[in-house]
């Protein structure tokens, strides 16, 4: 969501690409669409949980690389920025569907209500986070990637916690049987 609120400023003001902005926006959206399309095949091969793990690690790594390379410098060339954003959003394309499907697993019997609840929660969380990060995006796109970095690090920490909790529960059930 932070990208949606800052993309126009980054491309039109920071890079002076007012006329090209719709094409740039569409190009990055294609990376999400491509990942979503590929996800149908890859999730069968690797599983939802692995796809989430790999995608989060990719998202985190790309953010970290961008932040290290461009900390304290001016914006990189538009080609470099678009490459990083395209790869970031390619990772997001895998995350969206798989995270929603994983969230729906325990409440599949009430899928309609479950989808509404998970959509509501993700939006309620995304708005203040994107508003906060978006306030720092001026003159450079670096705060956008720092926001990606922090949010993906927190997501990985939550994922590790949930995997360990799932493992503990599984071990407890096996011991009691």
Predicted segments, located by residue:
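A late C-terminal transmembrane helix in Major Facilitator Superfamily
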Residues: 100-140, 147-148
């Amino acid at each position: 969501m932070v990208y949606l609120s800052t993309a126009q400023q980054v491309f039109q003001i920071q890079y002076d690409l007012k006329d090209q902005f719709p094409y740039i926006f569409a190009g990055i959206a294609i990376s999400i669409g491509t990942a979503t399309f590929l996800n149908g095949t890859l999730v069968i091969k690797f599983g939802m949980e692995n796809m989430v793990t790999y995608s989060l690690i990719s998202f985190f790594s790309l953010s970290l690389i961008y932040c290290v390379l461009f900390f304290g410098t001016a914006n990189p060339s538009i080609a470099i920025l678009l490459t990083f954003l395209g790869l970031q959003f390619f990772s997001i394309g895998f995350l969206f569907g798989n995270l929603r499907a994983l969230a729906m697993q325990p409440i599949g019997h009430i899928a309609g209500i479950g989808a509404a609840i998970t959509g509501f929660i993700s939006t309620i969380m995304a708005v203040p986070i994107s508003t906060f990060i978006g306030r720092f995006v001026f003159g450079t796109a670096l705060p956008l990637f720092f926001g990606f970095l922090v949010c993906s690090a927190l997501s990985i920490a939550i994922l590790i916690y949930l995997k360990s909790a799932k493992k503990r529960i599984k071990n407890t059930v096996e011991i009691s049987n």
